[in-house]
Amino acid sequence: MDIKEELEELKKKVSVEIDKSSSVDLIENIRVHLLGKKGDLTKILKGLKDLDPREKPVVGQMANKIRTQLETMISQKKHILEENKLDAQLASEKIDVTLPGETFQIGTKHVLQQIQDQIEDHFLSQGYQVMYGREIETDEYNFERMNLPKDHPARGMQDTFYLTPNVLLRTQTSAMQARAMDKHDFSTGPLKMISPGKVYRRDNDDATHSHQFHQIEGLVVGKKITLADLKGTLQALTDELFGKGHAMRFRQSYFPFTEPSLEVDISWNTVDKNTASQDIEWIEVLGAGMVHPNVLKMANIDPEEYSGFAFGLGPDRFAMIKYGIDDIRNFYLDDLRFLKQFCQVGE
């Protein structure tokens, strides 16, 4: 059999194989066995060197034509098989577009924001205003208007981040007291406000202290405001946040802007009349007291006619009690394993 006959026989054989092939893998095997380095067509073409020089152009042209025809047939068959495979796959993987799609992870309110919202809602229901102050405050409103003149020894109680000699990161939301009293028209009734926000002190971070923490200032100024009003206000707040059963303890303290001044502790654990005092674990949550007459005077309010109470509470500490968290630093570590425990319903 000469080369021409071999080429014609190969063309017929491969054409039949292409027609019968039923998968992309089979058609690829045909291509390799035909055109690969050791393929059938390659072997035949190696015999061209032994032909008479006059036959070489004729046989070479014939071989190239058959090669082109077979490559075209393989390509077309492969395309058909790929389309059939895709159609079969689509038919077997029907998508029900009425089913819900994949949900994306979304952010939720931080646990401290949740506590702050609960506290705000409580006081709004009691007729208070919510006033947001500035985190960068002046020395005048942060200290002087709070009865802390520049030479006052109590300034040493608070290590402060100063930006300039007269501008600082506020150390307390109490700075909002003077601004609120300056703006309020007392002819319309008493001033009742809370002011939530971040405060900054040069504290060493530990389990219960942080250089940056949240605080909510409360202030009521009006006629005949008493210490009993303050105690009742704080008891109502803790009962709503924690439920009844957490003991509250008032200790005498000192703050330059209140007189008398109190430290208020709340029990970690719930207690009843049978709980022994040594079994109660306390955590300090706020400072409070009656507004100092000097603070009222600096706001042009007559302390003989008006009185008031103020308190500053830490929502961080409230969250620790509410959820049994023993280290305040957990709130600021951005650990999703911790924070996801406090997702609200619907989030």
Curated annotation (Swiss-Prot):
EC primary class: ligase
Location(s), subcellular: Cytoplasm
GO biological process assignments: phenylalanyl-tRNA aminoacylation
Record SUPFAM superfamilies: Class II aaRS and biotin synthetases, tRNA-binding arm
Xref: InterPro entries: aa-tRNA-synth_II, aa-tRNA-synth_II/BPL/LPL, Phe-tRNA-synth_IIc_asu, Phe-tRNA_ligase_II_N, Phe_tRNA_ligase_alpha1_bac, Phenylalanyl-tRNA_Synthase, tRNA-bd_arm
Keyword rRNA-binding included in the entry's annotation: no
Catalytically driven reaction(s): tRNA(Phe) + L-phenylalanine + ATP = L-phenylalanyl-tRNA(Phe) + AMP + diphosphate + H(+)
N-terminal signal peptide: none
HAMAP family the record matches: Phe_tRNA_synth_alpha1 (MF_00281)
Protein name: Phenylalanine--tRNA ligase alpha subunit
Annotated organism of origin: Oenococcus oeni (strain ATCC BAA-331 / PSU-1)
Gene from which the chain derives: pheS
